[in-house]
Each structure stands twice: as structure tokens, then as C-alpha cells.
């Protein structure tokens, strides 16, 4: 397995792109992104967090809802969106909006996950585009890096 590689060009300050290779089939890795049971094992940033909610309606136009909860503070962070493209086990594209504490949702961005198989290994190419600004891109970069590491250590 390789470490997370991140690529960002200066003209794409609101887009992050990461790659990570896993010792698993494309089907296994794709399923880890779409199975509520498996998502609960890896979709969080900090060790003190857990995935309290993982709801998935895996169909084009279907929705998802993922909630990270901090064990110490009880703070909850929920992201919601809709699936735009599903091509198992090669591609997953979905919208991304954080729920706001005051109600409603924030800025919408887009996540594209490609699963590239070479037989025994699968490379995940994650592109998160349309983020609100460079600061948001940096925060999401930190979060996705942690999640991709947890995917390797806790789910595959």
C-alpha cells in the first residue's frame, strides 16, 4: 500500500485530488464506500470520533447521510448529498453538503471517486471539487487524508 498522495494546482485552489492504493479488489474497496456497515468503521477524522450515522440509498438520485460524532464533546458533523453516477466497481460521484448548526445545509461541492484495479490492488483517486474556498479545501484535505488512512487500517 502506498501513502496518500495529494495533487493540487494553484489555479484549482478549491479542488483537492488524492490517491491511495489498497491491497484489495476494486469490488471490496467500492463496497467499503457504499456499505453503511463498513462506512461506520472508517468514515471519521479524529481517533475520538465515530461514525454515528451512515445512511445510504445507493442509486442514481439516491441520498446519503454520514454523521461523525466526537466521543468527548458529543459534537456531531453531518454531510448529506445525492449520488450522481454509480458504476460499480469503477466510479462513484456524489454531491456533498455539510448540515449547518442553525439548520439547512452549506455550500455544495462534488466528490468523484475512481477505483482503478490492477488485479490484487486498487488505487482510489478521490477528487473533491467546488469547495467554497482554499481554507475549506485545506480542511477537507486533512479530513480526507485521515479517512483514507482509516479505510486501510479499519475496513480493508
Predicted region positions:
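Residues at helix-coil transition
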Residues: 34-35, 44, 88, 153-156
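Short helix/strand-capping connector loops at secondary-structure junctions
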Residues: 120-132
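Hydrophobic ligand-binding cavity/cleft-lining segments
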Residues: 1-49
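Hydrophobic-ligand binding "helix-grip"
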Residues: 40-41, 45-48, 54-60, 65-118, ...
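Hydrophobic pocket/interface hotspot
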Residues: 29-30, 39, 64, 83, ...
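A conserved amphipathic terminal alpha-helix motif
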Residues: 129-156
Amino acid at each position: 500500500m502506498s501513502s496518500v498522495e495529494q495533487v493540487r494546482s494553484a489555479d484549482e485552489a478549491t479542488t483537492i485530488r488524492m490517491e491511495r492504493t489498497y491491497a484489495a479488489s476494486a469490488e471490496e474497496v467500492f463496497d467499503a464506500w457504499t456499505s453503511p456497515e463498513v462506512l461506520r468503521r472508517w468514515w471519521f477524522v479524529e481517533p475520538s470520533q465515530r461514525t454515528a450515522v451512515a445512511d445510504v440509498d445507493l442509486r442514481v438520485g439516491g441520498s446519503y447521510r454520514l454523521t461523525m460524532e466526537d466521543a468527548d464533546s458529543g459534537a456531531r458533523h453531518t454531510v448529506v448529498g445525492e449520488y450522481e453516477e454509480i458504476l460499480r466497481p469503477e466510479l462513484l460521484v456524489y454531491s456533498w453538503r455539510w448540515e449547518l448548526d442553525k439548520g439547512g445545509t452549506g455550500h455544495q461541492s462534488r466528490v468523484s471517486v475512481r477505483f482503478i484495479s490492477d488485479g490484487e490492488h486498487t488505487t482510489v483517486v478521490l477528487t473533491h471539487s467546488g469547495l467554497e474556498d482554499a481554507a475549506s479545501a485545506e480542511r477537507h484535505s486533512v479530513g480526507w487524508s485521515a479517512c483514507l488512512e482509516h479505510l486501510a487500517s479499519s475496513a480493508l
